[in-house]
């Protein structure tokens, strides 16, 4: 059984990866190969360099875990923040926020959910939503 941690090189993702790796097999996903390589060596984990906002990789990333390996859990720590008034936000910036925060979650869950038997998926969100930051996307 394996746990998949997406956004594994961020503060939250790396802490979760380290804790889960103490007693479980983990597979790290991220966009920074240097950080992924370092973390994978530290906790003895496999990793995949994947940018879930890129179309070509979205179709392929579900193949990173062999079909005969059960996925016990999926942890999504991918996220970004754009603090800017709407009237000053370019369409490209808004689309990037959607790719990072929304579409990557969809790609992860749609690719791995059917392979999880009695597994769990955990998605982290921003504390900014509970604090009511002005000019927050």
Task: Identify the role of each PLM range.
Residues 9:
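Conserved glycine-rich cofactor-binding loop
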Residues 24-37:
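Conserved glycine-rich Rossmann-like NAD(P)H-binding loop of the short-chain dehydrogenase/reductase
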Residues 42-56:
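Rossmann-fold cofactor-recognition segment
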Residues 77-83:
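Conserved NAD(P)H cofactor-binding loop of Rossmann-fold oxidoreductase domains
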Residues 85-86, 93-98:
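Substrate-binding pocket helix/loop in short-chain dehydrogenase/reductase
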Residues 89, 132-137:
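Active-site loop-to-helix junction immediately N-terminal to the catalytic Tyr of the SDR YXXXK motif
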Residues 126:
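Residue(s) in the substrate-gating loop at a strand-loop-helix junction
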């Amino acid at each position: 059984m394996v746990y998949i941690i997406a956004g594994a090189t961020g503060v939250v993702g790396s802490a979760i990866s380290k804790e889960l790796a103490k007693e479980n097999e983990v597979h790290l996903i991220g966009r920074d190969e240097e950080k992924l390589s370092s973390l994978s060596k530290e906790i003895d984990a496999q990793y995949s360099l994947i940018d879930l906002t890129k179309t070509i990789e979205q179709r392929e990333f579900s193949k990173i875990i062999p079909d005969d390996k059960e996925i016990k859990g999926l942890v999504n720590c991918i996220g970004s923040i754009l603090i800017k008034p709407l009237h000053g936000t370019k369409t490209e910036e808004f689309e990037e926020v959607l790719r990072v925060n929304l579409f990557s979650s969809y790609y992860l869950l749609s690719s791995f959910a059917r392979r999880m038997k009695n597994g769990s998926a955990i998605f982290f969100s921003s504390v900014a939503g509970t604090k009511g930051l002005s000019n927050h996307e």
